[in-house]
């Protein structure tokens, strides 16, 4: 490795620590300069290769960074190839210095890929992987990969790679076109033998943005990445995406495949979950629409949001190769107050599973001014234990099923009636605790583009929850249709309890309470009840209690 000068990082006789401020200084300096697009130094044989050939280039694990050191984490590297045609700079940070990890073609086996060794000796790496013994103590497995733009993917114990996170999104789904900032340089702290975390710094650059990022990786059953970011804009943007997630949804029970397929579902994520600042929980099943769809959910100070994979049984996917049931959900937990803004969901048409077509991010209402730094911090959970990120005291949506709407005739034959039916199963411990004859009812709202022809709720003994059947007749098929539903029930209003005088002894307090209760009873018999008191028929006053998260679905246009 080549040593890099540490000007300004330490003074004589003093210890120093590389930190986010060092990367932010670089980002600030870059922001004041004209953007320079990265230059590719990749020979045509690598740039024009097909994916199958790119896969033949194999990194030699025995030559991983820190392979001979007693560190819990190791690094392996991606070779350039295909559209990964621009090198990134990768540095190692130790207690005393920063050194660049130089490209070495001897770390790779090229198979039958024809190439001239002279043209590869100064190429540089396209990205890197983090290795850690997450599944077996004697086996280094990939737990994080950083490759392309500002993308990174992470897994926990027993997971397989699925959706991705990004550093920043700019003007996503706008007619002007999206700008993809990229991580151009990394600094990785060399871990100590007993360390359970790995710290990675990254420098971000794009035509209209620069930024400094600190990613603290903590592997486990759920792997966590703590993200600190400090970003500068070179110029104004129209839409800013903070904590962006990118995933894939091809089809599933709420939008079955149009082509006969043995798989019941094919997706990396099935829904967007939002925990709003006001405490509301919302669940939005994903679609693969025929036209670009953008949904904005206004939220102030979000408590969390994420793209989730709730179905965890092999039978939900039936795919022995891709194991969608093992692909993690990603949950964003903001640190601090993020203010007013929206969680935005972008759904893009795709014909196959090779294209990521789902994007979700936080979009601040007030956009930062160019040149002024803005900071966001959040914890990113990669999990297959979704109930941990659902309201413990509310039921949630177990599944959404779509079907052709029909009516059962007198001869018991079902006759389609031109409607579309949605069956929504609400489940969870909060609902299972209720008796099956509990007076649970649905609370629904449907946009102007549809007429509700059935709203039926019944107990589901298989889930110990309730199944909502909602049938709609769409008015204009070329328009999308919004709908929402939640389950509620009436519960008695608890009478207000009088405050006790702290100076009274226990006996006096007990006597005063009893005396007051008698007077209250006499008064209740003599006086007319107030508007919010118990009804005159003797029934208890009630209030409506929300039992579940809100199911929010958009039926795409032209379906």
UniProtKB/Swiss-Prot annotation:
Residues 525-534 have a biased composition (Low complexity). GO terms for biological process: beta-glucan biosynthetic process. It is found in: Periplasm. One of its GO terms (molecular function) is carbohydrate binding. One of its GO terms (cellular component) is outer membrane-bounded periplasmic space. Residues 492-542 are annotated as: Disordered. Keywords: Periplasm, Signal. PANTHER family: GLUCANS BIOSYNTHESIS PROTEIN, GLUCANS BIOSYNTHESIS PROTEIN G. Belongs to the OpgD/OpgG family. This is Glucans biosynthesis protein G.
């Amino acid at each position: 490795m080549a040593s890099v000068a540490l000007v300004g990082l330490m003074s004589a006789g003093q210890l120093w620590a590389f930190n986010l401020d060092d990367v932010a200084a670089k980002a600030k300096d870059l922001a004041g300069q004209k953007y320079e697009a990265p230059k590719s130094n990749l020979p045509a044989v690598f740039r024009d290769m097909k994916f199958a050939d790119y896969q033949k280039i194999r990194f030699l694990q025995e030559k991983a960074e820190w392979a001979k050191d007693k560190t819990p984490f190791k690094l392996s590297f991606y070779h350039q190839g295909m559209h990964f045609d621009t090198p990134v700079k990768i540095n190692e940070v130790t207690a005393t210095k920063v050194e660049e990890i130089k490209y070495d073609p001897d770390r790779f086996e090229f198979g039958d890929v024809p190439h001239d060794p002279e043209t590869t000796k100064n190429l540089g790496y396209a990205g890197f992987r983090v290795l850690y013994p997450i599944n077996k103590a004697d086996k280094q497995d990939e737990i994080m990969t950083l490759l392309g733009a500002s993308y990174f993917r992470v897994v926990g114990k027993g997971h397989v790679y699925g959706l991705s996170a990004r550093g920043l999104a700019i003007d996503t789904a706008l007619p002007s076109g999206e700008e993809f900032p990229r991580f151009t340089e990394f600094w990785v702290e060399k871990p100590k033998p007993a360390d359970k975390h790995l710290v990675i710094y990254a420098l971000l650059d794009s035509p209209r943005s620069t930024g400094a990022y600190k990613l603290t990786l903590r592997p486990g059953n759920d792997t966590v990445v703590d993200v600190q970011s400090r970003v500068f804009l070179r110029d104004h943007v129209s839409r800013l995406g903070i904590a962006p997630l990118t995933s894939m949804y091809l089809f599933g029970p709420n939008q079955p495949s149009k082509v006969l397929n043995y798989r019941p579902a094919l997706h990396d994520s099935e829904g967007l979950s939002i925990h709003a600042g006001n405490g509301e929980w919302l669940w939005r099943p994903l679609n693969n629409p025929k036209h670009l769809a953008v949904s904005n959910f206004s939220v102030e100070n979000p408590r969390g949001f994420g793209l989730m994979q709730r179905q965890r049984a092999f039978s939900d996917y039936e795919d022995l190769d891709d194991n969608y049931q093992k692909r993690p959900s990603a949950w964003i937990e903001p640190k601090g107050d993020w203010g007013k803004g929206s969680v935005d969901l972008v759904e893009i048409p795709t014909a196959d599973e090779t294209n990521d077509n789902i994007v979700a991010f936080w979009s601040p209402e007030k956009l930062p001014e160019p040149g002024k730094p803005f900071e966001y911090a959040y914890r990113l959970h990669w999990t297959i234990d979704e109930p941990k990120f659902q309201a413990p005291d509310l039921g949630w949506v177990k599944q959404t099923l779509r079907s052709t709407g029909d009516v059962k005739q007198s001869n018991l034959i079902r006759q389609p009636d031109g409607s579309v039916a949605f069956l929504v199963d609400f489940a969870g411990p909060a609902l299972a605790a209720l008796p099956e004859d509990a007076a649970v009812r649905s609370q629904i709202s449907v946009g102007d583009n549809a007429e509700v022809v059935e709203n039926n709720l019944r107990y589901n003994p298989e889930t110990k929850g309730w199944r909502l059947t909602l049938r709609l007749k769409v008015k204009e098929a070329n328009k999308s249709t919004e709908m929402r539903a939640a389950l509620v029930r009436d519960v008695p209003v608890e009478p207000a309890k009088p405050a006790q005088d702290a100076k009274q002894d226990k006996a006096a307090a007990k006597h005063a309470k009893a005396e007051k209760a008698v007077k209250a009873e006499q008064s209740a018999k003599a006086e007319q009840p107030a508007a919010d008191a118990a009804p005159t028929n003797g029934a208890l006053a009630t209030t409506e209690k929300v039992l579940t998260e809100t199911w929010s679905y958009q039926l795409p246009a032209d379906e």
